[in-house]
UniProtKB/Swiss-Prot annotation:
Enzyme Commission code(s) on record: 6.1.1.4
Protein name per UniProt: Leucine--tRNA ligase
Short motif ('HIGH' region): ranges: 42-52
Principal cellular location given in the protein's record: cytoplasm
HAMAP family: Leu_tRNA_synth_B
Intervals of motif 'KMSKS' region: 634-638
Native species: Neisseria gonorrhoeae (strain ATCC 700825 / FA 1090)
Catalytic activity, reaction form: tRNA(Leu) + L-leucine + ATP = L-leucyl-tRNA(Leu) + AMP + diphosphate
Amino acid sequence: MQEHYQPAAIEPAAQKKWDDARISNVSEDASKPKYYCLSMFPYPSGKLHMGHVRNYTIGDVLSRFKLLNGFNVMQPMGWDAFGMPAENAAMKNNVAPAAWTYDNIEYMKTQLKSLGFAIDWEREVATCKPEYYRWEQWLFTKLFEKGIVYRKNGTVNWDPVDQTVLANEQVIDGRGWRSGALIEKREIPMYYFKITDYAEELLNDLDKLEHWPEQVKTMQRNWIGKSRGMTVRFAVSDDSKQGLEGDYAKFLQVYTTRPDTLMGATYVAVAAEHPLATAAAADKPELQAFIAECKAGSVAEADMATMEKKGVPTGRYVVNPLNGDKLEVWIANYVLWGYGDGAVMAVPAHDERDFEFAAKYNLPKKQVIAVGDNAFDANRWQEWYGDKENGVLVNSGDLDGLDFQTAFDAVAAKLQSQGAGEPKTQYRLRDWGISRQRYWGCPIPIVHCEKCGDVPVPADQLPVVLPENVVPDGMGSPLAKMPEFYETSCPCCGGAAKRETDTMDTFMESSWYFFRYMSPKFSDGMVSAESAKYWGAVDQYIGGIEHAILHLLYARFFTKLMRDEGLVNVDEPFERLLTQGMVVCETYYRENDKGGKDWINPADVELTFDDKGRPVSAVLKADGLPVVISGTEKMSKSKNNGVDPQELINAYGADTARLFMMFAAPPEQSLEWSDSGVEGAHRFLRRLWRTVYEYLKQGGAVKAFAGNQDGLSKELKDLRHKLHSTTAKVSDDYGRRQQFNTAIAAVMELLNQYDKTDTGSEQGRAVAQEVLEAAVRLLWPIVPHICETLWSELNGAKLWEAGWPTVDEAALVKSEIEVMVQVNGKLRGKITVAADASKADLEAAALANEGAVKFMEGKPAKKIIVVPGRLVNIVV
């Protein structure tokens, strides 16, 4: 055995050993319990970052722990390869997105392998490959035929200069991120998934997810947003019907969760796209201008919530069905046409947004809810105005005095009898628009025929292959400029037709990839029935909290779609979810001439610390001049505070990187980067190596202790007690608690006790062998390379075949225990007694204790309190 720890030598050797033995390559094996562990797959951006390292190390720790416990473990990896960053890089570097993506995949795969992750690379998928997205297209066509996928007009952000649709995050202050042009809202045909058909099941099945963080489930519940309310129809006033047709000429329909406040409505507001707004604006330039302004704004709901609320009156009126009041119709920029009916009833006295709007435009506020003796002030919003739990109706005629539920039912009865409304359950969740006017995505498998309409591409003509030799220029859709792509014949009539040139939202690929891993080379469907039956759901899923809503919701939705197609036999995709925290690091900057900030990498900064180790000042190493310490933030390119994992691996080895990531913080909390923490992790591994080296140097490996420990010294019994209590704790930390930092700390404590114990005797060496063999197995999930190497020196066998250390229950039973002795509640000494000592024996031993005798000062004991196994308190 080498005297010194040399990760650069042992890590490639250990990895070759695992690869040769194919320990990560699995197939269905009914003789073993299965364990499917999955970390969210990465976007192939070019390099791994520390967030990736943390995410995949957590997954690998759990996978290796289960492997040693006899499970058939699948831990696959792939690439979420479509998306905008590849198009942006392509434009910047004048290279096809495909070439850029495949180069990045190869480099990142090399990085992942260097970290020693037990990944089954034979299951690798890349979502940009036709053999993957073929089956996504196939499912799309099946769902289109069923009506679960449909086409309708949707509102998008349109860049008139680049002639392209922009995502909400690409619109900055109302302008295109690349062109700087003022953005317009446009209506274009788009494809939608009817996720709303599954809203109730998606909501109810959250209750089945016992091993998901409550925070994630709450976020999904809020996103689905089930509410019980009423549809209310306000009759259009006779003098306001001009320009309106059909039902729009008869009534204005709204949805409200507060029908009890209907008597307090003082105006109604409609979206700029509402037919009533269009009709009112026909001869009013000021309305036309406001509608144009609204249409130029963002279509993001989050932006709607924070932007300034604006409106204009239309001069049109509707009639309140309860009291006959005429209410003016306003066009408001906060009402979304794509949500509900594109109209809301406004009750300024009891809704904060309506209150602010009414105050701005001097509209009336009518109180119809009272809470106790609180006085209503029309000039100031108070929280109780919106209280439906404790309020009763006032100023509402025969409804006065009713509470919320009673008033709800009474209003429902009145409106239903008039045909002016009915109760309705509504969801905040909207159907999922998956059309993207981009190049680097999965082609939508639809052919447009003038005679036959929208025709799905038949299964035997799939996949519709995306041309990979395209370099986008950012001007419009490349596919729409390629006749060789879009010119085709109709599958129904054989006539000339045109392919759809939109591509799919990249959330599509990540909504089912976990099923494709089960049979990645299966050529007859999305997943083989045999594989789907064996692997079932993912047992453990790991990823960031930022994916709590969209990705996880769409993955749950797709699972139900695939179940209903008979492809899988589970209702939910992920049994257990771990959302790891971010990796954060200090940030430093200098202000530049333009008033901005030039961010400086922490490696280029030298710090001065106070006597408590806190940084008080910083200078740039290059010039010695000050820089501003800006606090810790998530590692990012924009703040230039990232640490390259490759540099860490090159300097310290993969095991040090893995150990630091698991020891620095519990997995669900943010991890603060620390150079000293990395050095500390490396020191521990050197110490572990040296401990085994020194043990073997004194006489080589022996047979580990097993059997009856009655003949052992107390010191060796205590060491075995520590060993087996540590094994029990670490097993629980890995398996149930998933707290890897405390598992590492427990093994460190075990090695501390080992160092203090005399193991020079024959029995001592056998116990030492037992301790060291167990320690390297307990740490193998976290630092597998060093442990694999040390195991081969200690045992000569293959660690992955050794199994998890078992707990010797006899070793956990201590023949003697240490008990604290107190006098008047203050600790004065300790006594060692038999574990089964009686109360009388404990009292006698405590009274004889030297510290107790001293502090009793010759006084008799008035009372002796015994807490078995813990303490004796003598009261004098």
